[in-house]
Amino acid sequence: MKKWLAAALLAVGMGHAVSASAQEVTLALPTTSLVFLPNYVAADRGFWQKRGLEVKSPIISGAGSSNAVLSGGADFTTIGPGSTLRLIARGQKLSIIGTTVDRFLLEFVLRKDVAAKLPVKPDADLAARVRALKGISFGVDSINGYSHSFLRYLTGRYGLDAERDVVVSPVQPGSLVPSLAAKRIDGFIYGQPWSLQAVNDADGVIWISGVAGDVPELAPFAYMITIAKPETCQQRRAVCEKLMAGLQDALDFIHADPEGTFEVLRRKLPQMDQGLLRQALSVVRPAIPRSTETKVEAIEKAQEFGLIGGMMAADEQVKDWRIYIDNSFVRR
């Protein structure tokens, strides 16, 4: 592995040269976020270019990136499983060809003064921490999105009603920490780097952490998957092989070179405080798998989350996910 990685780094260090015959493909992303770290590394380090792929990654918000794949506006997307599983359950033809984050990353953050008044401490068992949230006001990035569904998932499992027992307001991610600091909300549900920023700058307390393994039944969890229409990889198999090989190179690089990975993020997110970015990377990096292989269990966990969290209807449950997972592009 070390010899292979050294050779790969040498190759991409020589100007990221692209041949005149490079194939252009579009891999849409739904937003800019740390969870797309493998995609950023593959692009920045030239892992796709050295294979003759020119990968364009336009931002197409939310589920729009999945719809772009279906309509032919994009060849691929890397996205959370929610909209994809729902589309497949509703009969849309999509293949899951890889996983690049396999740990659930969302966290509940409370203001320190709010947490201090609750009847339990942050180290109490999960059920007690969830039940203590009755009456708390939360900010989420979108109603019916992943953060809201995480609230519904946990309250549904531990005896609260997310629609009656807590207050939920939509808050843009960039406004979550300021809203917490201004005491407009008691807490929020989101991921890195905002949860860390709340702890650092707004007297926040991590109350429940998917990153730290507080919800073990959600592991493994296919948190970021890459999808395509089946015919894309049937008709252009070499393109799918090259795309996933580049993402595998990125996984290897992330685990082998933490400092180099930080430099990629620093270039991608120059506006972010470097200390916070480094902290956030230390949290996200362990959630990056060693292989792009998609585990059936990880998709089943994502489906269960969607069913309990209200992202999927009960009659949309898929019984066998194996027919929708294509691991033939995984480097063995």
Where does each model-flagged region fall?
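Short, solvent-exposed loop/beta-turn-alpha elements that line the ligand-binding surface or hinge
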Residues: 50, 115-121, 213-219, 285-295
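N-terminal signal peptide c-region/cleavage motif recognized by signal peptidases
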Residues: 14-19
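Pocket-lining segment of extracytoplasmic ligand-binding domains
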Residues: 174-267
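Conserved C-terminal helix/tail region of periplasmic/extracytoplasmic solute-binding proteins
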Residues: 304-332
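Bacterial N-terminal signal peptides that target proteins for export
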Residues: 1-6
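Soluble non-cytosolic domains of exported or imported proteins
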Residues: 60-63, 78, 141, 145-146, ...
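Short, glycine-/small- and polar/acidic-enriched structural segments
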Residues: 23-161, 167-170, 186-192, 220
